């Protein structure tokens, strides 16, 4: 009985977090502006909120992959896909050799590149999954939530770049990437493509979380940053 109550409490907490907008300040916010539309926030608090947001996106991406697997991907197919190697690739993100050589600027811009590379594909995923006959509401809702919150995360990171690097960044237009992902030859191939997309997004969501936590570690002047 206790475990059932705890599960209900945790589910309620997750629902509250899913509906609460953690980040997403207007892109025209300036340091000297006041009011509720452009709240004053310190760099540390902004980074903390962005990290919380990234953590939640990664958690929901894991839940989405699990739901999708249980609904559409037999265990034998999963094993074959796992043996097939890594089908994921994020464009324009170079691989650095040693952690000490990665600059804060590289971390920030690479994080933004990864985020922007997924805004279009996630919106396309919504289009294809709406065509499924028996897609559970939980999976559809999580997919829509990730798409929306990823755009909020993009806004938060652009504000962070402005604060840390004094650079202005344009927010991407997800509609520019919709055509490439929206059409698949048949349902089976579409399901496999969507599953690959979800698993690749999960990996990149974890990458974004790791980059942001490394950045936070450096801001705190800790000696344990090599763990990232």
Curated annotation (Swiss-Prot):
Disulfide bonds: 29-38, 88-200, 217-225
PROSITE patterns (UniProt xref): SOMATOTROPIN_2 (PS00338)
Glycosylation sites per record: 141, 177
GO terms for cellular component: extracellular space
Compartments where found: Secreted
Top-rank lineage group of the source organism: Eukaryota
Keyword Metal-binding in annotation: no
Family the entry assigns: Belongs to the somatotropin/prolactin family.
Name listed for the protein in its UniProt record: Somatolactin
């Amino acid at each position: 009985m206790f475990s059932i109550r705890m599960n209900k409490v945790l589910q309620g907490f997750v629902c509250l977090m899913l509906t609460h907008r953690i980040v997403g300040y207007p892109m025209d916010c300036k340091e000297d502006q006041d009011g509720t539309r452009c709240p004053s926030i310190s760099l540390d608090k902004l980074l903390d909120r962005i990290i919380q947001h990234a953590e939640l996106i990664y958690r929901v991406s894991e839940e989405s992959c699990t739901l999708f697997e249980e609904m559409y991907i037999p265990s034998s197919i999963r094993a074959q896909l796992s043996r097939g190697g890594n089908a994921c690739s994020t464009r324009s993100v170079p691989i650095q050799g040693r952690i000490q050589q990665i600059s804060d600027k590289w971390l920030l811009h690479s994080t933004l590149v990864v985020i922007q590379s997924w805004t279009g594909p996630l919106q396309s995923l919504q289009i294809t999954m709406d065509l499924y006959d028996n897609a559970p509401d939980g999976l559809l809702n999580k997919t829509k939530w990730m798409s929306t919150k990823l755009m909020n995360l993009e806004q938060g990171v652009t504000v962070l770049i402005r604060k840390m690097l004094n650079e202005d960044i344009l927010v991407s237009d997800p509609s520019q990437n919709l055509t490439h992902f929206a059409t698949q030859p048949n349902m089976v191939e579409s399901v496999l493509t969507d599953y690959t997309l979800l698993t690749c997004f999960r990996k990149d969501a974890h990458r974004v979380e790791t980059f942001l936590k490394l950045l936070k570690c450096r801001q705190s002047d800790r000696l344990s940053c090599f763990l990232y």
